[in-house]
């Protein structure tokens, strides 16, 4: 198996919680540590699993009515750091940045909000910033990180975990990265179409 990587820490930031329970149960069984924010963190804890708050890592609260939660160097550094790069690893130690091996995201439902006839203000609030940034960061660093970019992929990761435990190979991670850029491309195309109408 080429370039196998162990999943030790998962950042979970999702809008839709349905279908997440079984995946979290398997990750917990494999000893994976959870990191999350807001509603997702409460959901994880409601299932009986320990979950570290993103705010505890960043030492910065969620601000601007929840518009800024995960956008912080300690989170993005943990995703983007190259595990085989000595300079990156030294900086992670220096700035106490934790490695994040798995990112699970489910974006704000922009298209559904538009289709519901919501106001422009409500539609704008459903333009995901942190989530799309997490998707791009995880996909860019697929050499080291697994990115699950939507609830449609929960089952795909669950199947891998059932077969291999909390390990993935480079082919798995590249497949998720391809799907991630597909999700981000579709999402931004929908936003562009709304602005262009």
Specify the residue positions occupied by each region the protein language model found:
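N-terminal glycine-/serine-/threonine-rich phosphate-binding loop
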Residues: 1-57
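Structural motif
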Residues: 2, 27, 92-95, 137
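Internal alpha/beta core interface subdomains
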Residues: 5-8, 97-197
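Short, basic, glycine/proline-bearing loop/turn elements
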Residues: 6-13, 73-80, 120
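Conserved residues at beta->alpha junctions
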Residues: 14, 83, 148
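Short acidic, glycine/serine/threonine-rich loops at helix termini
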Residues: 22-24, 45-49, 56, 63-66, ...
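Glycine-rich nucleotide/cofactor/substrate-binding loop typically near the N-terminus or early
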Residues: 39-109
């Amino acid at each position: 198996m080429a370039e196998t990587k162990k999943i030790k820490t998962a950042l979970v930031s999702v809008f839709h919680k349905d279908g997440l329970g079984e995946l979290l149960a398997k990750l917990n069984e494999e000893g994976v540590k959870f990191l999350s924010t807001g509603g997702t963190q409460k959901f994880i804890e409601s299932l009986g699993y320990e979950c570290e708050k993103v705010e505890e890592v960043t030492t910065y609260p969620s601000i601007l009515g929840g518009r800024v939660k995960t956008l912080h160097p300690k989170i993005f550094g943990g995703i983007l750091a190259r595990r085989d790069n000595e300079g990156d690893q030294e900086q992670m130690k220096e700035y106490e940045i934790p490695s994040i091996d798995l990112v699970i995201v489910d974006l704000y439902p922009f298209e559904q909000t538009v289709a519901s006839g919501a106001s422009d203000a409500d539609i704008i609030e459903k333009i995901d910033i942190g989530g799309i940034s997490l998707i791009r960061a995880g996909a860019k660093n697929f050499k080291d990180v697994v990115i699950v970019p939507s609830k449609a992929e929960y089952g795909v990761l669950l199947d891998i975990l059932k077969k291999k435990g909390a390990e993935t190979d480079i082919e798995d991670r590249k497949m998720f990265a391809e799907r991630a850029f597909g999700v981000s491309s579709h999402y931004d195309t929908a936003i562009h179409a709304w602005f262009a109408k």
